[in-house]
């Protein structure tokens, strides 16, 4: 079981990396809103097919009203607002630096979980947050040293803000997802989020 989880985690990391590269190129060609719309539409189609094959139910008709509420809010925040911030950051500072900022999302999620869900923050989690934050600061400062011109630095600053906002948005979305999905099917739960994003 641990091996399956490790393979899944590795596969997720690979997919995240590839998708970031594709999204960066897409935003430069058709814009942020275009990429975001096509992303959620394709996601809905694939999720519907997956749910139909695995559960025999292409639409999440068995979800409770509470599940619909939490996951719909999560979808709008995560797949609309957050991804608009993220894709704008891709377009401004590139996928490499933007993805680096996403590394602080688990830290924001842990803090929000502590505040709203009363989850416990272990000391090693606090140390990890500090290390990640330090790494991001070093990367940003290194990039600033090789940049020349006020306009370029202002564009970078704007990109950093959008990347940070996307990280925070992802964390807020995750808190709503935790509350909504609980024991519900993960694929169908994600489909609710995607459906709300298409409407939103």
Which residue stretches match the model-derived regions?
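Loop-to-transmembrane alpha-helix entry segments
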Residues: 59-65, 102, 109, 113-138, ...
């Amino acid at each position: 079981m641990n091996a399956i989880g490790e393979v899944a985690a590795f596969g997720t990391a690979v997919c995240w990396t590839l998708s970031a590269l594709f999204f960066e190129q897409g935003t430069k060609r058709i814009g942020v809103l275009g990429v975001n719309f096509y992303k959620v539409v394709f996601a809905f189609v694939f999720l519907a097919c997956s749910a139909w094959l695995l559960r025999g139910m292409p639409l999440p008709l068995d979800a409770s009203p509470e599940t619909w509420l939490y996951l719909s809010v999560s979808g709008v925040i995560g797949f609309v607002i957050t991804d608009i911030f993220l894709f704008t950051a891709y377009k401004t500072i590139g996928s490499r630096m933007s993805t680096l900022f996403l590394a602080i999302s688990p830290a924001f999620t842990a803090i929000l979980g502590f505040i709203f869900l009363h989850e416990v923050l272990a000391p090693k989690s606090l140390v990890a947050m500090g290390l990640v934050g330090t790494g991001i600061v070093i990367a940003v400062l290194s990039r600033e040293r090789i940049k020349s011109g006020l306009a370029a630095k202002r564009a970078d600053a704007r990109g950093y803000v959008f990347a940070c906002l996307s990280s925070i948005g992802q964390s807020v979305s995750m808190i709503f997802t935790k509350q909504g999905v609980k024991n519900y099917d993960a694929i169908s739960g994600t489909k609710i989020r995607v459906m709300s994003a298409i409407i939103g």
